[in-house]
Amino acid sequence: MANEEELQTAESAFVTGARRYSNDYSESESSSKHSGCSTPVEGTPAEAATTIGARASGGSTTWQRLRQLLMERGSDVHLPVTEIHLKSQEWFGDFITKHEVPRKVFHSSIGFFTLALYVRDVDYRNVRLPLIVGFVHVLLLDVIRLHWPAFNTLYCQVTGLLMRKKEVHTYNGVLWYLLGLIFAFSFFSKDVALVSLFLLSWCDTAASTVGRLYGHLTPRISRNKSLAGSLAAFVVGVISCAVFYGYFVPAYSHVNHPGEIMWNPETSRLSLVQLSLLGGFVASLSEGIDLFNWDDNFTIPVLSAIFMHTIIAFSQR
């Protein structure tokens, strides 16, 4: 067996290499969201991290041997990404994980679920409390798992289908999602809050999907953002606003109480077509802005709500 000094050196070198690879791997996946391209990586994360760790340790031990020694000693190495395989990887493989298919399906379904609540006359003001409760629960779980590796492994096995690899050892993007919606549903009218949610649910998904597939064919407009992704957000934003204001608001007018719907064709200088086009522009702009490197799940509903409220308010006769 290797002596304690050699073991510590090998362990330190391996963990350093694995973390360095994990960061590069996460950054390359993040950059591919809209540009459709990423840094080529040889092998799986675990294989590449093993190679880096072995090289960093001077080849004095292999990953398998190091793990055996650490297990014998009872050491728990907290490795980012490389030691935890997400459910989407286990069930569908790396392609589905890379393109975040389960996450996008869930992301989009929230918009349809919210629309169903709207037509069933669920008071939008009652949505805030469940959102706040959900935020507190997810935050507590994240704090626990980020300080308890064993629980983190179990957590990722259960919810990993909806997680990004970079979230394995960082706070969950759901926190930002909930925080953005809490802001929108707390300070804006019913229609503005709902539209901001639709733009987050559908436009962000469209931008990510189209950007990954065709972003390399169009110019980049900012870091990790492509023209293809922004155009997709614009088109879906136009459709979302047109369908909501053009069909659902008048068809289900009985679920709207006085003052809840801010835009009215009789009191606004904006027609439905103009409002929808501006809604698409808001979606594209909110999705494309990189605000202090904050999470899109927070900036999109917040900026969308602010922009839509401002547009509708200034267009009143």
UniProtKB/Swiss-Prot annotation:
Cofactor(s) recorded in Swiss-Prot or TrEMBL: Ca(2+); Mg(2+)
TM spans (from-to): 131-151, 168-188, 191-211, 231-251, 272-292, 294-314
EC number: 2.7.1.174
Stretches with biased composition (Low complexity): 23-38
Reactions the enzyme catalyzes: a 1,2-diacyl-sn-glycerol + CTP = a 1,2-diacyl-sn-glycero-3-phosphate + CDP + H(+)
Membrane-side (Cytoplasmic) residue stretches: 152-167, 212-230, 293
Name under which the protein is recorded: CTP-dependent diacylglycerol kinase 1
